[in-house]
Amino acid sequence: MTERSRSGKTAWDKEKTRELFRRYKETDDPDAREQLVMSHMNLVRFLANKFKNRGEPLDDLMQVGYLGLLKAIDRFDPERGLEFTTFATPTILGEIKRHFRDKGWSVR
């Protein structure tokens, strides 16, 4: 039986994520990038849900959030010892807030 962390991911999942980042950073493997995006889609959904009652469709917010996720994946350095979700959350939120700002809406 594997030990689960508070987030519900097993230690194997975290190690697999680290390995995908190493592979992506070393070889620019598009398959590794795609797997990283797919494995973090729930993070984008969770963060986009915080803004869903602001007059924008959830699908649009998630699309903007995915742009932030892609930026975070491209900029993340696994050697720094930081969890990816900790690194990616401000980038995803920033993209969503920028979307509202560009439309002229105030988000607090």
Listing of model-derived features with the role each one plays in the protein:
Residues 1-106:
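Alpha-helical promoter-recognition and RNA polymerase-docking modules of transcription initiation factors
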